[in-house]
Amino acid sequence: MAIGTFAQLKTAAANWLDRSDLTDRIPEFITLAEARFNRNLRIRDMETVSTAISTTAGTREYSLPTGFVQMKEFHLSTDPITPLSYITPEMMSRLWAGSAKSKPQVFTIIADNVRLGPNPDATYTTSMLYYKTFTALSDSATTNDMLTNNPDV
């Protein structure tokens, strides 16, 4: 049986369970599996690129994209490209606590935000390669990259 949709996955799970008393719980089992995949996997299907962050002079903190899990690479789209190095939040506070402005050199992640150091002195376009969560399967979102490319996991 090919498994390519949420309905087909639920049917396959029901076949494997071979128990009718758990059929109504199958969507819950799928949700729990998706949470585990998002927590433990870092595979190519989870990679995405965002150029949504454009800095503003003097503003150092920006919201991370929805579904962000982990940064893989982050740079300013300058000529030549300016790679941004990760430092811990503690190091960011020690090195770039003031209001000095210059071209950012480093970044850290605090909660759902990325913080740049030093404060940007101008507008810069960024490019972020990061791992994102898989789209959660449901009756309205019947497939995602995990199910399409890895239905056997």
Where do the protein language model's features map onto the residues?
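Glycine-enriched, solvent-exposed interface loops adjoining structured elements
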Residues: 1-153
